[in-house]
Amino acid sequence: MEKYKFLTVPGLGSSGPAHWQSLWENQNPKNFHRVEQISWDLPICHQWIEKLDEEVQKLTEPTYLIAHSLGSLTVVHWANKYTSAMIKGAFLIAPPDVENSKRLSFIEGFSPIPTFKLPFKSLIIASTTDQYATIERANEFAHAWGSEFINIGKKGHINASSNLGNWKEGQDLLNDFINT
């Protein structure tokens, strides 16, 4: 991972200090940069995609997007509106089903979820015990977006609550994704 640049796109509430995204950023500060949203707790889609685009416009080297949860949908909505030759791929972890989740009814503008082939390679990693999307729905997203799909089993929402720590499995999957 040290020879590539990464832009992390956290989801609702951002990624706290025990989240694998934060741990990866702290271990590789020269290679990782986080998109900072205006409001992490009251997400508005057009604001989130504009903040992502601001960061993408600053890129000077080819970069991979590493998105978690609502950050994954931010990437998809961004790609539906913008493009950049600097984006080499998107690593999309636990995209939520905002169209069918009552837990996420307060978020604004993320529904409907775009259904088009992303203009860069992408990988969705999902869990069979994610409370924000069924494994079947995550697989539907992969088909719609032209993404590879990996089911990693019972890992919850693949966040700090999943007790993944540095998420070595995720690092290995990212390295495999980059090298294909």
Name the predicted role of every residue range.
Residues 11, 36-40, 90-100:
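Active-site nucleophile loop of the alpha/beta-hydrolase fold
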Residues 17, 131-137:
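Conserved alpha/beta-hydrolase "acid-adjacent" motif
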Residues 65-76:
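Gly/Ala-rich beta-loop-alpha elbow adjacent to hydrolase catalytic centers
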